[in-house]
């Protein structure tokens, strides 16, 4: 073996991977690269949020202020066994949320939030997935978690096709069981609609904030409020119906979604019959540019691509199953986002949000009590990357 090849292999072993190392013949290396694909993506952001509607660990000095850094990195490995079979694994760093005066300990470490096999029956346009993956349903509000759901997914068509019908059954991280069905239909090149059903089930045990003998709240080492378990564990469900649409105009795209939790008691044991505002969620958004996905879609656009979005949201605390950090539970208000692709695979975006609490949200990370009607200003600056 040549000295350069030995050095390349040694470096790869020190880095924890041997994928793509050029220690074989040129023909063998080309064969591997044709089948193998690696992607590195992630976000580093700084947020300032006076009312903790943003998601991520904040200050741990019990001041109730919400500001700090948030970061995650993912490495996705795809191996095309042949034209019909694909193996995918994604390594997730977890979220490094370091607030002011808080050391970044990252106690959970990295983990695989995706690990699945996909088989495509191209003749019948059917696609089967077995393993750990996730999904984005509706227009990304009612369910948006692309990992940590282990089970089976069957779909007629792909999500980018004019017609796609998808069925999913699996167990989510944390013990929740999820069923979903979704039909997405394009009526023209500019218009598409979705009709979605999502059901989640879990064993839930009620909790109450922990207090000392004087009635003062007790906190964990990271500044979060301690909770005590009360009562027996019960099997609870969430059951969502959801409708959404996307319409492209000249230079502007409109997207909107409405969802409602049909359950009498949700997975947290909350009685929802008289909580119409808390069990429903909706948003409408107008954006310019090719995408409103600033974290994942914008980095892969041409350098110099600009995108701007204006969104009004009214999201009840129990009106969605799981969403990304661009939606805020129990809040209504305006969210503005501007982003630009600065390098190949690299973009930046800036967010301003003005949100009002729809209900009494209980205690925030540091014991701050959020009241109905409270307003919050949200500022976020993010660096997004996706390298292939």
Residue ranges and their predicted role:
Residues 16-17, 24, 59, 77, ...:
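Intrinsically disordered/low-complexity terminal segments and short unstructured peptides
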Residues 96-97, 137-138, 173-175, 201-203, ...:
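A short local loop/turn or secondary-structure capping micro-motif enriched for an aromatic residue
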Residues 1-33, 220, 388:
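Cleavable N-terminal export/targeting peptides
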Residues 174-221, 225-241:
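Loop-centered beta-sheet repeat module
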Residues 64-196, 283-322:
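Outer membrane beta-barrel
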Residues 2-4, 32-68, 101-107, 120, ...:
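Outer-membrane beta-barrel pore domains
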Residues 18, 24-26, 181, 243, ...:
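Compositionally biased, intrinsically disordered low-complexity segments
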């Amino acid at each position: 073996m040549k000295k350069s090849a030995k050095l390349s292999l040694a470096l790869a072993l020190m880095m924890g991977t041997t994928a793509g190392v050029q220690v074989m013949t040129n023909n063998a290396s080309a064969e591997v690269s044709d089948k193998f694909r690696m992607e590195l993506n992630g976000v580093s952001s700084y947020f300032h949020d006076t009312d903790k509607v943003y998601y991520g660990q904040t200050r741990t000095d019990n001041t109730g202020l919400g500001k700090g850094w948030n970061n995650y990195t993912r490495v996705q490995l795809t191996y095309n066994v042949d034209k019909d079979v694909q193996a995918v694994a994604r390594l997730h760093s977890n979220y490094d949320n370091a607030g002011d005066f808080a050391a970044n300990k990252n106690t959970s470490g990295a983990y695989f939030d995706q690990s699945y096999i996909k088989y495509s029956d191209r003749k019948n346009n059917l696609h089967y997935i077995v393993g750990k993956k996730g999904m984005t349903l509706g227009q990304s509000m009612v369910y948006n978690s692309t990992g940590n759901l282990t089970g089976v997914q069957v779909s007629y068509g792909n999500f980018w096709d004019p017609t796609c019908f998808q069925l999913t059954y699996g167990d989510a991280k944390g013990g929740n069981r999820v069923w979903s069905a979704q039909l997405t239909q394009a009526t023209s090149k500019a218009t598409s609609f979705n009709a979605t059903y999502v059901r989640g089930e879990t064993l839930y045990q009620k909790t109450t904030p922990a207090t000392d003998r004087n009635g003062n709240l007790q906190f964990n080492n990271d500044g979060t409020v301690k909770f005590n378990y009360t009562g027996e564990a019960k099997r609870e469900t969430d059951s969502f119906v959801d409708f959404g649409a996307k319409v492209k105009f000249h230079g502007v795209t409109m997207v909107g979604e409405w969802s409602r939790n049909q359950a009498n008691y949700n997975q947290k044991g909350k009685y929802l019959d008289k909580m119409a505002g808390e069990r429903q969620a909706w948003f409408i958004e107008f954006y310019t540019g090719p995408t409103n996905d600033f974290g994942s879609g914008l980095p892969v656009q041409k350098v110099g691509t600009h995108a701007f979005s204006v969104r009004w949201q009214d999201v009840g605390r129990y009106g969605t199953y799981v969403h990304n950090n661009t939606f805020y539970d129990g809040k209504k208000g305006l969210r503005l986002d501007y982003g630009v692709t600065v390098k190949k695979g690299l973009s930046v975006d800036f967010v301003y949000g003005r949100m009002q609490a729809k209900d009494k949200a209980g205690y925030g990370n540091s014991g701050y009590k959020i009241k109905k009607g409270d307003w919050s200003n949200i500022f976020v600056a993010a660096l997004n990357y996706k390298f292939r």
